[in-house]
């Protein structure tokens, strides 16, 4: 398969995930233009996933109905699981991709670094968040978003996408800025990792498989 043929491969996925706590549909196109439609019932999470899809230039649709009357945790984490599954499915055989991606993202006083390896070996390192994010609540027009969930989101995404993901908050104060910069950094790193390398049409591994 030539690199031109690789580039014509459709990299789309649809995941439906239903449990007693949530009902989720995720549609993802890795070669989109940043067209995003998000409805999770948690407005701040909608804002974060909109940022992720837009800054990765993925077409992303997410519809989640969860038990938000209890709290947002199940809805947020289960959606991240489904998003990771969609990412892994859309990648297909991974031929011709760059595999690695990283991004530094500032947001006012905050700076975040994210690094991705589409390795097939799921792992997540999440570090650097100030202690106050362990008990901070961001209120929206619907259900509050507890920033302690940030780590769980990225761990769930990495585990189900089968990628190595490192997210490092270098510094920051505002919980909104710190959280949003992480989503945007991950978005840009993912976008870089899944781009096709015009010099290479095979699987980017000396083992021949990822």
UniProtKB/Swiss-Prot annotation:
A biological process from GO: L-histidine biosynthetic process
Highest taxon, organism lineage: Bacteria
Claim: Transcription is one of the keywords in the record: no
Enzyme Commission number, as recorded: 4.2.1.19
Cellular localization per UniProt: Cytoplasm
One GO cellular component term noted in the UniProt record for this chain: cytoplasm
Keyword annotations: Amino-acid biosynthesis, Cytoplasm, Histidine biosynthesis, Lyase
GO molecular function: imidazoleglycerol-phosphate dehydratase activity
UniProt record similarity statement: Belongs to the imidazoleglycerol-phosphate dehydratase family.
Protein name: Imidazoleglycerol-phosphate dehydratase
Native source species: Mycobacterium leprae (strain TN)
UniProt lineage: Bacteria, Bacillati, Actinomycetota, Actinomycetes, Mycobacteriales
